[in-house]
């Protein structure tokens, strides 16, 4: 069987590529870290940098171009100008795209999200400065929409993940937010400990996102963007309460070494979808 191939973008301030690459490999993918310039210059020449040979494209977290002109703006411009047509072809071929934190900001600036009516050019939503005016680094509870078409969150109802950003507030017009909810494109909302949406309350909603929106997808469910970091929860010891989890595992005589974090479920869903679709 051929492997499920994932491409993780690197370069110019993207700094979560190693853990994202690791998470994809844990999920069963053949993952490659590829510099943006290599991808742009290497089309068709080397299978390790030829986008058409991959099934999953990852815009990871970090601070691309130091967030100059706004988070994800320069990265989106460079991608759109140089390989925008290849990205659109990648999407038309039924492949998967995920944007995490800075990657989500880039997808929004590219117009790939929300992709209303199949339009992957128009920018219609934004991720802007946190209400606090400060960079945040904490963990959040997420409520996952059970009706969403998002392929990455299949079988997940709630999940805890870390967030670390300065421009994570989801903002859009009332009309566009209503459209997102009507089409079930709102994938994840910040939630309280009871699993209910945070209703804008801090710290459960850490940035002031309208309607507690933490992640959205396009109408097909194959393009997903979220501010929290699933790759940041690749092992149970990543969690701030890991010592309590360790005590429970030891009591149940379960393996500690191989007990992965819940964030891997998002990547595994992607790998399993591609495996089934392409029979790889």
Kindly label every feature range from the protein language model.
Residues 136-138, 183:
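A short, compositionally biased
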Residues 1-100, 104-122, 128-136, 197, ...:
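N-terminal beta1-alpha1 cap of cysteine-dependent amidohydrolase-like domains
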Residues 144-280:
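C-terminal and late-domain segments of enzyme folds
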